[in-house]
C-alpha cells in the first residue's frame, strides 16, 4: 500500500506540475508598433501627453520628427492583446512646426482597472527623434522620461517614473511625483 501511495503521489505531483507549466506557457508578450514621421524645421515644438508609457527623446541633424510607439501587452492570447491595444487611442497632429502626440486609454471601467486588465499587463514605449534644436512639452501619467543632447526649452512631467536629462541646453521645468530626477 505504501508503494502504491508513493506512485499515486508522484503521478499527482507530475500532473500538477505539467498543468502549471502549460498554464504559464500560455502567457506571452504581444507588441504593436505605430510609426509616424513629420517634416519640421529646427526650433519647433513637440507636445506629448499620454495616460501611460515611457517617453524617450533622441535628436538628429535632420528636419524630421519621427515617432515610434510600441504598445506591449503581456497576456494570454493575441486576440486579448488586440482588444487591449484597441482601447488605447493614439492621435497625431501637425500645425506648422508644432507636433502633438496624444495617447489616451478609452474604457468605461476607468484608468486603474485598465492597468491590470484582470492580470494582463499593458505598457507603451515612445521613442521619438527630433531635430537637435527643438522644444519639448512631455507628460506621462505612468512612465519614465529620458532626453538627451537637446538644445531647447523642456517641460517634462511624470506621475510615476524617473526623469533623466543628459546634455540638455535651455530652460528646464521637470517634475515627478514618484521617481528620481537626474541631470
What kind of feature is each model-predicted range?
Residues 2, 23-49, 54-140, 148-158, ...:
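Acidic (Asp/Glu) and glycine-rich low-complexity loops/linkers
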Residues 8-10, 40:
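General helical structural elements
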